[in-house]
């Protein structure tokens, strides 16, 4: 059975880009007779906004979204992540990293998503002294392409050794890394389809590699075009995207429908009816492949 999900992070309130992702993932799930889960990705407490998680859920309800089952919170699933990391340790696929980020990045080259780790701690004899601090844990990556066929973008691949380097699964500050948590959650929740923004396209080969290492199924992916401001920057909390105005729900839904190339919906002041329209007329093939300027 199709199982999709929407997984916001409570580092801020939902904005127009969040709404586009929610509508697209919801419409794709419901039009395929599937389930739509909501997962709160609250992995990084220092970056979270107090009250954001409850506000996000209230906003989704106000826009007419109905999810299946209870909301999942990553902050309550550490035991699952510990078990997942233990499996990788047992298989000899991960190693402790004692490197200081500032030091190793000083001589590192840039890759597809930041600096490429130089692999110093891969070899026990080369690891620097820990100096009383707990290490991070990295996974060894292969020198080969990891690719997939995206439902919107098409073919996409990375050579993880060249483009990314051995990446962190557990941080030295004691927090779980996004890449491990999202793979563990998707597998445990039986997620079969992931519809999300193209800012996460670059993370997908890492997640597929982790799925392969753990022997869990790889979902089907579709990465949506990003909404950008007049300066070409992605609308986000960092670029001061305004929070969704609950007094303009109908207008905002229609705006997102236009971005997703849905036909004009009939007049109604009920957000749930507009979502039903989106489900009935959903066509992934019509979704644009490139960024959309959203004033």
From Swiss-Prot:
InterPro entries: Glu-Q_tRNA(Asp)_Synthase, Glu/Gln-tRNA-synth, Glu/Gln-tRNA-synth_Ib_cat-dom, GluQ/Sye, Rossmann-like_a/b/a_fold
Residues where ATP binds: 237
Keyword line: Aminoacyl-tRNA synthetase, ATP-binding, Ligase, Metal-binding, Nucleotide-binding, Zinc
Top-level taxonomic group: Bacteria
Co-factor(s): Zn(2+)
Cellular compartments per GO CC: cytosol
Cofactor binding comment, as recorded: Binds 1 zinc ion per subunit.
Record's function text: Catalyzes the tRNA-independent activation of glutamate in presence of ATP and the subsequent transfer of glutamate onto a tRNA(Asp). Glutamate is transferred on the 2-amino-5-(4,5-dihydroxy-2-cyclopenten-1-yl) moiety of the queuosine in the wobble position of the QUC anticodon.
The protein's name: Glutamyl-Q tRNA(Asp) synthetase
The organism of origin for this protein: Neisseria gonorrhoeae (strain ATCC 700825 / FA 1090)
Organism taxonomic ancestry: Bacteria, Pseudomonadati, Pseudomonadota, Betaproteobacteria, Neisseriales
Gene this chain is encoded by: gluQ
